[in-house]
Amino acid sequence: MKTLLILTILAMAITIGTANMQVDPSSQVQWPQQQPVPQPHQPFSQQPQQTFPQPQQTFPHQPQQQFPQPQQPQQQFLQPQQPFPQQPQQPYPQQPQQPFPQTQQPQQLFPQSQQPQQQFSQPQQQFPQPQQPQQSFPQQQPPFIQPSLQQQVNPCKNFLLQQCKPVSLVSSLWSMIWPQSDCQVMRQQCCQQLAQIPQQLQCAAIHTIIHSIIMQQEQQEQQQGMHILLPLYQQQQVGQGTLVQGQGIIQ
């Protein structure tokens, strides 16, 4: 209301001043003496200056922060550029170059099929192996004894080969059952011959007896074994012949 009153007073003063200027030009000198005219300028400058700058604080803060944020998605579009050059360049040169030269390896497998022909000839070497134990027996040499002593020891050798056991029976009973048996005669001869041999040579003589008995038993066993091995060896030779025929068929 104050502002309206001030405006009306100013309008009335202006109209009165203009009317006086038109009527009396000499009255222009009296206008500077009137001081109440510049007073209405003070409320106009005080009241609106305080209210109008307040809304200016809200507008620059809010919109300025929100608009630069949408610039972030521009970084995400640059990422897909990395996987496209990396993936296709690596697998294409590596894979096709390696498998093609590997197909040349099956050419080596064909000459390997000739190896089974050598395996059939191997069993031929194994058959004469049973003859090897014959070499070990003659290596055992008896101690050297004079031929005269060997003849003296022969009754003891014969006594042992007959497997007589006069010690297990009482001498009286033995004489009653077999008064003059072969074992008793050979035992007496052996004792007589050993008594004639010097004591230094008795051990060597007994050793020769035992060694000769062992050699005779081994020879008998070998002869019996040869009778058994000969038919087996013949069967093996027949089997080798069939294998050779089979090789000819395979070839």
UniProtKB/Swiss-Prot annotation:
CDD domains: AAI_SS. Residues 1-19 form the signal peptide. The keyword Repeat applies. Keywords: Repeat, Seed storage protein, Signal, Storage protein. GO terms for molecular function: nutrient reservoir activity. Residues 42-81, 100-139 have a biased composition (Low complexity). Coiled coil: none annotated. Pfam families: Gliadin. Residues 82-99 have a biased composition (Pro residues). Residues 26-143 are annotated as: Disordered. InterPro entries: Bifun_inhib/LTP/seed_sf (IPR036312), Bifunc_inhib/LTP/seed_store (IPR016140), Glia_glutenin (IPR001954). Gliadin is the major seed storage protein in wheat. The gamma-gliadins can be divided into 3 homology classes. Sequence divergence between the classes is due to single-base substitutions and to duplications or deletions within or near direct repeats. Belongs to the gliadin/glutenin family. This is Gamma-gliadin. The lineage of its organism: Eukaryota, Viridiplantae, Streptophyta, Embryophyta, Tracheophyta.
